[in-house]
Curated annotation (Swiss-Prot):
Species per Swiss-Prot/TrEMBL record: Actinidia chinensis var. chinensis (Chinese soft-hair kiwi)
GO molecular function, one term: acyltransferase activity
Protein's name according to its UniProt entry: Alcohol acyltransferase 9
UniProt-listed InterPro entries: CAT-like_dom_sf (IPR023213), Plant_acyltransferase (IPR050898)
Gene symbol of the encoding locus: AT9
KW Nucleus (keyword) present: no
Length: 432
């Protein structure tokens, strides 16, 4: 039976504690792209110290939120479409971020496994209680064992993963009074014009936006079949073994592979094989690549808007399944190496109005690397989180940090129920 979650206080809007500019800010072309019209939703679970005062903790979180919204005041605004529909703006009038407090009969140990369904943990972030959902919503949920879950939702068009982690670490530092607001680095930087369209017309080929034939009923299957969440942890030893396998099966690997290259390749290959797709079906692996230091000049420290493009590895089911892990890792490496300043600028042009390019879903697996964001360091005075993950585990594959295991990675993704057993077996059998 599903565990219950119940609000114990009326939802509130928390405004910045000090006056902030009343203005309308334009989001960048990357921010405004159609692909990012969804929230980033984190779930952090803390083993609360014995005897913690709930009222004091909740008040401390609320006060810290109000203080952190002063430098990050756009998160207290509201996103709207421009009158000419060319992009998005943030109307900043200190409307406030959402804050909720709840109780649940979940325990911290419930989050050490994969959820039973895609939306099992949905009520740990009840954004729908707000008539207009703010760009930032925080929900503090007290668990039955005395631990606490913190659900945080960001509007992805306002902030990316790196930016959200910088905000959360400031928020947490202010909650514990470990740092003064004036001392915190890096200072948040708006400067969204740095990633706007420059009106280029001669653009290169970008496979992430290309369409491939659906030879397998791929879209229908993922839309209609129940998806089952999975969670598998790869430790340092296992990752080293994947690197060895990749080197032994590669035709081009001259340099040692990174953990990301081999793990992404292994997941992609296992996922494809488990779905039993036609040999000629073209598949794509998409993953985010931070461009803060790839564009010229580099973006300023503290830039918290969307500053990533999608790397794209592409091949057929036949080649992906028959050519081994080294081949897959080479495709991932090649996709990373293609991204430089020119490539990133072309993506900006491609997603801008009126082109508005967006990835298709046919044959696509998307990976997002949360394990390197620093979410495992977000400490509100309750210690470091014992679990870091998403509110909902869906078809986006997430790399997550594992507490006290620096080089380990937890992989969460939901796959069609008919394929889940084979997927998990293949993931645990890298030599197969």
């Amino acid at each position: 039976m599903a565990s219950s979650v119940r609000l114990v206080k009326k939802p509130v809007l928390v405004a910045p504690v000090d006056p902030t500019p009343s203005t309308v800010l334009s989001l960048s072309s990357l921010d405004s792209q159609l692909f990012l019209r969804f929230p980033i939703e984190y779930l952090l679970v803390y083993a609360s110290p014995h005897g913690v005062d709930r009222d004091v903790t909740a008040a401390r979180v609320k006060a810290a939120l109000a203080r952190s919204l002063v430098p990050y005041y756009p998160l207290a605004g509201r996103v709207k479409t421009r009158p000419d529909s060319t992009g998005l703006d943030v109307v900043c009038q200190a409307q406030g971020a959402g804050l909720l407090e709840a109780v649940s009969d979940y325990t911290a140990s419930d989050f050490q496994r994969a959820p039973r369904s895609v939306a099992e943990w949905r009520k740990l972030l009840l954004v729908e209680v707000f008539k207009v959902v703010p760009p930032l919503v925080v929900q503090l949920t007290w668990l039955s064992d005395g631990c606490v879950a913190l659900g945080i939702g960001f509007s992805h068009c306002v902030i990316d993963g790196i930016g959200s982690s910088e905000f959360l670490n400031l928020f947490a530092e202010l909650a514990t009074s470990r740092a003064k607001l004036s001392e915190f680095q890096p200072k948040p930087v708006w400067d969204r014009q740095l990633l706007n369209s420059a009106g280029r017309t001669n653009l290169g080929t970008h496979p992430e936006f290309g369409r491939v034939p659906d030879l397998s009923g791929f879209v229908t299957r993922f839309a209609q079949e129940r998806l089952s969440p999975t969670s598998i942890t790869f430790d340092k030893t296992w990752l080293k073994e994947l690197k060895n396998i990749a080197m032994s099966t590669s035709q081009a690997g001259e340099f040692p592979y990174t953990s990301f290259e081999v793990l992404s390749g292994h997941i992609w290959r296992s996922w494809a094989r488990s779905l039993n797709l036609p040999a000629k079906q073209v598949l794509k692996l998409l993953f985010s690549i931070n461009i803060r230091n790839r564009v010229k000049p580099s973006l300023p420290a503290g830039y918290y808007g969307n500053a990533f493009v999608l790397g794209c590895a592409q091949t057929s089911v036949k080649d992906l399944t028959e050519k081994g892990l080294g081949y897959c890792a080479d495709l991932v490496r090649g996709a990373k190496e293609r991204v430089g300043d020119e490539y990133a600028r072309e993506v900006v042009e491609s997603v801008s109005w009126p082109r508005r390019a967006s990835p298709d879903s046919v044959g696509v697996l998307i990976i997002s690397q949360w394990s390197r964001l620093g979410l495992d360091r977000v400490d509100f005075g309750l210690g470091r989180p014992v679990h870091v993950g998403p509110i909902c585990c869906d078809r986006y594959c997430l790399f997550l940090p594992v507490r006290d295991r620096m080089e380990a990675v937890k992989v969460m993704v939901a796959v069609p129920t008919s394929a889940v057993d084979r997927y998990e077996n293949l993931m645990r059998s890298p030599y197969s």
